Amino acid sequence: MIHTLLASASIPLDKIQAKCGDPKDFNTKQKKVILYAYNYGSTKGLGYTMAAIAWQESCAGEYMVNFSDPSAGIYHAHIPGVIKKYTKYKDVSFVRNFIGELLMRDNEFASKVALENLLFWQKNRKGNYKEIIKSYNKGFSWEKNKSKNKSAEAYYQDIRMKVLKLRSYIPKYTKAYNNSLKIELEDKNQNIKNTLKDIQDSRKQQKNPIKKIESKDKIFIMPEP
């Protein structure tokens, strides 16, 4: 019966599978996630690492939850670990759901969790990058467990390769994003100037001219967040 239902309601996988293999194929949302992760981590010298982890764990924000871990967010933070470190609540289903939803909804909180975890291991492993990444993935467990060490080693190699690729692509993303933002702000400023001009012209027609803005009074247009 179950097989019949699944067959009759087959999921169009081609429509839900995101492109995760190469950053040049990322969509706009994925590029923004990668840039966000990079900018958040770059203040601590871990920008490319944060971006690589976001790419590795969630396909740059496309797959935000793993029920088997359970983990969630753009970096797939381990939910029980987040509950233990950042709350005083018991690890029960309701709290897991709440924290999971928070990690998926709030990229800043998810980034805080990921960066603090990396910084903890950076200190603990005395700056050994390979051990930092292996420990980020498996904690201390890889040290005395061959299977977990093999898994942690593979994770490190994945992150290392992604960092190398992102060193080529993130500067391009940043330049394209900044150009796009510049054009957007210029358009907004031009629209505001046009609106002010229309108001001035309208008031002139009503013989109630608008007071001219002195040259010393500069207009600054704050970009929207």
Predicted segment positions?
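Non-Sec secretion/translocation targeting segments of pathogen effectors
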Residues: M1-A9, I221-P225
